[in-house]
Structures are given as C-alpha cells and as structure tokens.
C-alpha cells in the first residue's frame, strides 16, 4: 500500500459531506486532487438533492446515438493496433514475511459479527439447490465445477453439503471446506505486505476469503473516524451489502494483504454460503507461480482518502480511490458482459489511464442495450444478484430482460431462478417505481404451464402487495400477473429429505459475535500462519545404549511326545488357575440351584412373615402415593414446573460444564440457576401445554436452541467476570482425562482372552454423565416424586400388594470341560464339548 496524500486531518463531517438526513449507500472516498479530503457530493447517495437518474431511454432517443456509436466504433477498431503480448510481473525474489505480517493484526479463522442478524443473505431456499448429478461412468466429470453448467456456481451460491446431488464429488464448497490457494505473504518495496502465488493457480479459483469483523453502518462510520484519530494510514473496509461492512483493519485474514492493481488478476465476489453472505478473492485468469495477487480497490475497498497507485501497469490511473460504481474503468467484467458492452469498451478505450479519464455510465457513455442472447443468460442472472446495491446497473439489466421476446431465453431465465431474483428485486428495491415496473413487465412475458415456480419462489407475496399500489400502471400489471398465475395448476412432486431446514440451527450454532470472540479468543494461530521454513534444532547428545550380551542359541526342542491323558500335577500354574476358576463357577451354579429350590419349597409358609418384615417400607411408599393423589392443583403445577426446570437445567449444566473451571463453584451454580430460570420462563410462555404432559421431554431442535442460548449467556458471564477480575484460569488438564500409565486401568483389562471377566470398568462417558447428574441434583435438588411416578408406570407398581421378594436367577450350568495338555506346547488349549 502506498502513502496517503498529505493534507489536513480528516474529520467525520469531512468524510460524510452532505445534509444530516442523508444516508449514503456506499462509504465516500475523497477525490485524489482534493487536499481538504472533502467528498464531492453526487447522485450516488440515495435521497440527495441532485436530479434523479434519467428514465429508461426510448427507441427514438437511441436512433441518432446508435448510428454515431457504431460508426465511431468501427473507426476505432480500424485504428486499433495489435495488442502486445501480456507478460505478468513476477515478485518471486521478495522474501516471505509471515511472522512480521502477523504482528500487524489479530488473525481470525472466520468472520465475526457485531450482531447475528447482520450478514444474512436474502435468497430463498429455492435458490440453494442445483441440478448437477455425478456420473460414475464419466471419470472426467466435474460436477458443480468451474466448467460445469451448475446454476449455483453461476449465481455465486455455494452448494450445501448433503443436499447437492453430486454428493462428495461436488466442487462448489470452497468456503465451507476452506479450499484456499497456495500463497505466501511477502514484503514489497512500496506497497507494504502483499500476497504471492506459490504455485500456478487456475482461473476461477478461490484465493482466500475476505475475513474480518462484520459491522453495521453506524459502527463503520465510528471506526472510520477512530482509525483516522489513531493515525492508521491503511483501512481494510469492504462493503458486504447495503449498510453492512467487513472491517479487517485490526482483525481478519491474510486476504487483507492483497494489493491493488489497475490491471488485476483477481476480483472480489460475494457468495451465498448457507444463510450468510461472504466475500472471497477469486482469480480472473490463470496466475503463474511468483505472480502477485491483486484486485481493484476503486470500487470494492473503502478508505477516507485517495492514495498514490504503485501498480506499474500500462493502464494505471495514478490513484487509488475516488471512483464510483458507474465508472467504466473499474467496473467488474461481469457487469460489462451482462450489459453486452465488453467489446465496445475495449475498442474505444473507455477504461482510461493516467492521461485519459475513464467514462461514466449514463453520463458520458450511454450503452446501446440489446435483447439477451443464449450465452448471456447466466451473466445477466448473476449480475442481477450482485446489483442489489446499484440501482443504475439494475435498471439497465432489467431493460435488457424486458426487451427480450424470445421464449427460449425466458425459459432459461426461469431456470436460473428468475422468479426468486425478481422476488429479491421487488422486496429490496420496492421504493423505485422504475425498477418495479421493469420487473413486472418482464415477468408478464414469462409463460408457464404449472405454478410450482411461483410457489417455490414466493413471488406472489410482493406482487399482491403491489396490486394495492397507488401507481395505476404498477397496480394493473400486478393484478394481471396474479390473475394469470391463479389459472395455473400446482404439480405434485414427491418430496425428498432436505437439509435446508436445518440451515437456521447450523447458522445459529456456527456464527460467533464480536463479543464472544473477545471472550473466547483462540490462543493458537490458524493453519495459514504455520511457518513452513526449515528450522535447525540442536539436540543434546544421548548416551548410547549398551549392547546386549550375546547368548548362545538354545538347542532345538526335542521331538513331540505322544498325547497322553493329562495328570493334575503336570499342569502349569496358568492351567491350574483356569481350572480352579471353572470348578468354582460350577460349584456356585450348583449352590444357586439348591438355594432356588429351597426358596420355592418354603415360599408359601414364609409369605406372611416376609410381608410383615417389609411392612415399614410398604407403608412409606403407600403414604407417598396417597400424598400425590391428594395434591392440590397448585401443588401439581409446582411439581410439573420443578420437573421442567430440572429437565432444562440438565441441558444448561451440560453446556456450561466446559467453562466450569473458569469460575468458582458457587458462582457456576448461581449462573446455571439464573440461565435455567430464564429459559423456563420462556418455555412456559411459548408452550403452556407442558402442564398436560406427565413426563415432559425436549426435542433435539429445542435442545440445540437451549445450548445456543446457554452459550451466548455464558460468554456474557465470562466477559463480566473478566472485567471484575474474577475469571479463573482454566485447568491445564481435565480430571476426567485417562492416564494411559494408570495401573488401575491396566488391571481392569483382562490379560488372557479365555479367562472369564467378572467385572468391567465404566466408560469415561458414563462417568461424565454420572457426574453431570450429580451436579444437576446439587444445583436443582433431587426429584423423588419423579422417580416414584416412573415406578408407578411399571407393571410391578400397578398392583396394590407388593410382589414377593425376587430371587436372583440361577446361573446356567456350565457344560463339561475336557482339558488337553500337550507337553511341547507352552499354552494349553481348552476344548468345549456340548
């Protein structure tokens, strides 16, 4: 990054020149020649006093301009010299600077959000599913890849794992799987740190996600002024969507080090990943090894003043900043292709340079719009999704759709989720009558046979709202569409299991706020910061081991003797122990059978005495049952609330248990109760029918919501304790961690597979569940009534008279054992005969 232009220190008023009631859609950038950093207010701000954009250009207005434009284009093409061969500049001689660059900011593995309700995408669920299928008979198939016909990839929507029909062969999950390119961080001569390709990178490859703190516009403006006051020379703001920005100035990923170029090899793209909108740096062409990774800052990145550009490209405009979204020189290639003006822009040299100013869309360059052709459908659909913050671009794209009469193009647009795109247009830009009118006129030409797409896209909702509009033309078109759609029939399709329904829960669990990240900060650096350089370590000399004394080889064993009936005194100690164990078990079996027979013989005369001996226990149980039978309604309601409280408390304690070592035990119990009480109140308010259920339970979805709420609640507690200095350091090792050298653990495992095992050691998970249950009882108390209710539901408790004492089942007798011992074999073999 270059040095900023010298001038007076900017203030917040200087950064946002204009009326107080103005709310800019994009952050301002000072023009390069303004020493006072004053932003020249233009029509890029909605609600400005400047005249509104011109209405759509009619055919009569385009006639003279069309002729002049075509003639001038032909002249320019005839004068245009043959292009020189492009040779990228390599920076493979620069040293890597991973560690030095890491000291300048705090690394994040993924974006963190000021609130969880920002950074959300506006797409319908219907747009999340593509049509790609993996063909196992085609080894060269690339489902959902860059060269495929994947709808999701064309619209910058990432496929959902488990939902895409290509399965594990899907190539459109770069963000979720963190499939980043192989790059290095280097220190440049004039531009600060930069990124360099460590290997050849193909076109349309994700270099790195642009990671940072996602903040709202109010926070963005405050940070702009704060960074200026702190003397920070380079800002790293990127506009995610309307009134939402990614700030990678102090926290982010290595994508922040990608430098600017007026002829970049990469571009910034906004992708829908699950429920979130995320930004990534993608290659526009093949990038060779040693080439610097660059993209154009003039539209995608924002700062408070312009800076000198050091890209060194032939078409360098000289400065970074001061450009608008309608500047042809910085316009994304996607929009040029979608407007169908790429060839015209290149032929007339409209992108500008240091000596020539670039053209402005609809100001000094009015494009000649034509109907959409087949190869442009995907570009137009993708450009519409990317133009929700650019009304002027959206108007031009909708004009192309409106003037297209080819039914085949209409079907292709509907296949590219055209109705869902129009739903976004009518909901996000409903205040612009020109755009709304163009959208309605376009959809009025789309012919359907069934209304499934209408239902899936939910387009009927905004159209019904427009049917009540005060504009007669908009109202008439909306009613006409609703009437036409009502004549269509809905086709039934067999529904398949979808994972889209779980996206909300996954997003809630996987999204972290800035406050949570500040409390639970990762101590280690992400994998991208691992130092791959060779490190030499001096190891202390180790005393050589003494060689074992060579011993003579034993003589060969004698020939085997004939098998004889084993004598008891010739058996080894292991054989004797095994035989003793078998004999003891057989004796136990005989004794158990004899005891069972004796009990059966004496059951009748002793029945009365056994009942009289257990009379106190029976009286106590009968007293508890009578007490519950005569409970008042208030007592029953209190009992059910206590059960619900303990049921929710068990999930809360389990979720908070990982932070138990960071606070005192009494403090942990206090906040666990408070969190549980809050959730119980919410559950009682939302689901009053819990009182009708005798044994309440929680669904998996509700447990997930409780865990998410508990996680946020615990993070706030930890932050509060940290501010008061009461936060304890977590223990270095868990008390439940198993020591592999523990002799007790070794003793619990059997040394011989043939020896019967008498007892087993409970697993670590069982111990943890037992301890969690004890902790829940310690916090909320044991519920004896619940245990008694469960006992009543069993068949034994349904009778008024208790059952006689049960006798343990007799152990089945063991089959006779015949042991054969061979003298020349060290381990005897036991043969079980039935």
UniProtKB/Swiss-Prot annotation:
InterPro entries: AWS_dom (IPR006560), Post-SET_dom (IPR003616), Set2_fungi (IPR025788), SET2_Histone-Lys_MeTrsfase (IPR050777), SET_dom (IPR001214), SET_dom_sf (IPR046341), SETD2/Set2_SET (IPR044437), SRI (IPR013257)
Biased composition (Basic and acidic residues): 692-703
Protein name: Histone-lysine N-methyltransferase, H3 lysine-36 specific
Top enzyme category: transferase
Comp. bias intervals (Pro residues): 25-34, 551-563, 802-816
Polar residues compositional bias, start-end: 604-613, 730-766
Biased composition (Basic residues): 720-729
Bias-annotated ranges (Low complexity): 541-550
PANTHER family the record matches: SET DOMAIN PROTEINS
GO biological process: methylation; regulation of DNA-templated transcription
Principal cellular location given in the protein's record: nucleus
Family assignment from sequence similarity: Belongs to the class V-like SAM-binding methyltransferase superfamily. Histone-lysine methyltransferase family. SET2 subfamily.
Domain Post-SET per the UniProt entry, residue ranges: 305-321
Catalytic activity: L-lysyl(36)-[histone H3] + 3 S-adenosyl-L-methionine = N(6),N(6),N(6)-trimethyl-L-lysyl(36)-[histone H3] + 3 S-adenosyl-L-homocysteine + 3 H(+)
Enzyme Commission number, as recorded: 2.1.1.359
Xref: PROSITE patterns: AWS, POST_SET, SAM_MT43_SET2_1, SET
Cellular compartments annotated: Nucleus; Chromosome
Segments for region (Disordered): 1-83, 531-568, 601-638, 680-703, 720-818
One annotated Gene Ontology cellular component of this protein: nucleus
Ranges of compositional bias, category Acidic residues: 775-795
Domain SET: 181-298
Molecular function in Gene Ontology: histone H3K36 methyltransferase activity; histone H3K36 trimethyltransferase activity
Keywords: Chromosome, Methyltransferase, Nucleus, Repressor, S-adenosyl-L-methionine, Transcription, Transcription regulation, Transferase
